[in-house]
Amino acid sequence: MKARGRAWKYGDNIDTDVIIPARYLNTSDPKELAQHVLEDLDPEFRYKMKPGDIIVAGENFGCGSSREHAPLAIKAAGVSAVIAKSFARIFYRNAINIGLPILEAPEAVERIETGDEIEIDFSTGEIRNLTKGEVYHANPFPEFIMEIIKAGGLVEWAKRRLAK
């Protein structure tokens, strides 16, 4: 499984209230959530980004409240992956559970800039910065995590397993 898109780089401690402001938590409709992803941090993000683009962030991405709305909004907006130096553990689990690929890759975060064209091979953990001609590495997902992501999340994965 691969992803390719432009990078959108943000800093450390991007919390779930910044990813999807609390005033929109009265809905769980992914399309509506996507309209407001990162709007308090980068009001133009939803207009500038294209499907497949990649969020790059610093330490502790997804900290704060435990809400599935945050990774759901990111995925619904068309973001293909998030690369960060580190993730809040609850965000990490929620992202996998809804099928949003996320990678911890501190070196990549240091080198990637907004606008760089990035390609990720999730099976190897290889991150290519096509703009700079550089290659970075992250730990690839274990096979069972890849199965969950490919299925579109834990619920879809479980449905498929139960249908067998």
UniProtKB/Swiss-Prot annotation:
Biological process, per Gene Ontology: L-leucine biosynthetic process
Gene3D superfamilies for this protein: Aconitase, domain 4
Keywords on record: Amino-acid biosynthesis, Branched-chain amino acid biosynthesis, Leucine biosynthesis, Lyase
Catalytically driven reaction(s): (2R,3S)-3-isopropylmalate = (2S)-2-isopropylmalate
A family per Pfam: Aconitase_C
InterPro entries to which the protein is assigned, alphabetical: Aconitase/3IPM_dehydase_swvl, AconitaseA/IPMdHydase_ssu_swvl, IPMI_Swivel, LeuD, LeuD/DmdB_bac, LeuD_type2/HacB/DmdB
Pathway(s) the chain acts in: Amino-acid biosynthesis; L-leucine biosynthesis; L-leucine from 3-methyl-2-oxobutanoate: step 2/4
Entry GO MF terms: 3-isopropylmalate dehydratase activity
EC number from the UniProt entry: 4.2.1.33
Oligomer and partners: Heterodimer of LeuC and LeuD.
Protein family membership: Belongs to the LeuD family. LeuD type 2 subfamily.
Function, as annotated: Catalyzes the isomerization between 2-isopropylmalate and 3-isopropylmalate, via the formation of 2-isopropylmaleate.
NCBIfam families registered for this protein in UniProt: leud, LEUD_arch
Protein name: 3-isopropylmalate dehydratase small subunit 1
Organism: Pyrococcus furiosus (strain ATCC 43587 / DSM 3638 / JCM 8422 / Vc1)
Lineage: Archaea, Methanobacteriati, Methanobacteriota, Thermococci, Thermococcales
Gene: leuD1
